[in-house]
Amino acid sequence: MQRRRVNFHTLGCKLNFSESSTLAREFEQGGFVRVAPDAEADICVVNSCSVTEHADKKCRNLIRKIHRRNPAAIIVVTGCYAQLKPQEIASIEGVDLVLSNNDKGELFRRVAALAGKGPAQFTSCDAEELTNFFAAFSSGDRTRAFLKVQDGCDYKCAYCTIHYARGASRNMPIADLVKEAEQIAAAGQREIVITGINTGDFGRTTGERFIDLLRALNEVEGIERYRISSIEPNLLTDEIIAFCASSPKFQHHFHIPLQSGSDSVLARMRRRYTTAKFAERIEAVRRLMPDAFIGIDVIVGFPGETEADFRTTYEFLERLAPAYLHIFPFSERSGTPAVDFPDKVQPSVATRRVEELEELCRRLHGEFCARAEGTTDEVLFESTMRGGMMFGYTGNYRRVKAPYDRSRINTICRVRLGRMDDANDLEGEIVDN
């Protein structure tokens, strides 16, 4: 008897990828064969994102594409878009089941109970009912795993639907997360990215502290590198910074959301810090880790953002000189306070501001990578091969390429860094360990 086939289509954040990977393992343990997203399948699972209107549109288009390619397949949609607008998704041709984030852990059981295609079924719940914690970590990548430690957010920023899509901040106990990290190590992966919706807010459920989680994970044998996927500036404490600086396992790599370099815009966004506080946190990182990779999120075109506000943001970022910028044009989301804010910014103006910051990002990232030319660093090489080259990352997230050598995959090598190419990749020459 031929085993049933399932594929996964994951949109959005690292948390979604960790959850999709866990769901896929359940299907495989239940007798299914996981196939590639573009392969013919009996079950197609879409794990959706809803951070912007563009993300919603991308999900709708993906569902239609899946149905055209696999008209007989059962299509299941879960994730944040499914949580926020289940009926909208259920109305799309080809969709059979829509599951809220609360019911994501029931996905395999619900699919197994379906007799075949039919009228779309959906589950829904309010944000206050989002209390389940779906434990998840990614597998399959030979080098890096994403470990979900926290879910939900209590911040309710003026532009954001995450609280409604993910519920209140909650977490797994440290002891359980250590066991999951040990499973990852046993599978041969060497790097863990610690991920969540508001990762630094860890501990709301158990009364534990994020710093204590970091210390516990630091003791797991077999894991050689940790990265913190993202942390709010007001939660990036001196204690966390000092620990990351002192631990050989925790990489000098920080992703810190700013959103605007204008204090008046930050206040309207309902963010929990000022630009002075943000700059002070960056300085605290650089005092102990001068060559840390710092990535910053920025939103442009927020209602009321004047040209002067944007110039202030641009100049603030230029002074901070992060290694990378993640730039987003403001996207109006129904149900958020920002929908009713006056002084909307024209899309053409927002687009021009995005382009200006993208140009700044290219310059800053190039400068950050070029500073390593002629130095020696440790690189964890991944299984990716293009044009006879393998690629890997230094601890502070500079990408390095070297001639492919299978024996070096998933190992940390001492590498002499040479010239940087047009993609900001550094040429690497492996030095005997």
Describe the function of each predicted region.
Residues 32-33, 73, 96, 223-224, ...:
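A structural micro-motif
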Residues 1-195, 200-201, 239, 254, ...:
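Proteins enriched for Cys/Gly/acidic motifs involved in redox and nucleic-acid/cofactor modification
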Residues 45, 80, 107, 194, ...:
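Residue-level signal for inorganic ion chemistry
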Residues 55-57, 168-173, 203-208, 268-271, ...:
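Short, solvent-exposed loop/turn segments at secondary-structure boundaries
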Residues 340-433:
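Terminal RNA-binding accessory module
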Residues 305, 321-322:
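Contiguous mid-protein beta-loop-alpha structural module that forms a pocket-lining wall or clamp
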Residues 76, 84-85, 186-307:
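Conserved SAM/AdoMet-binding glycine-rich loop
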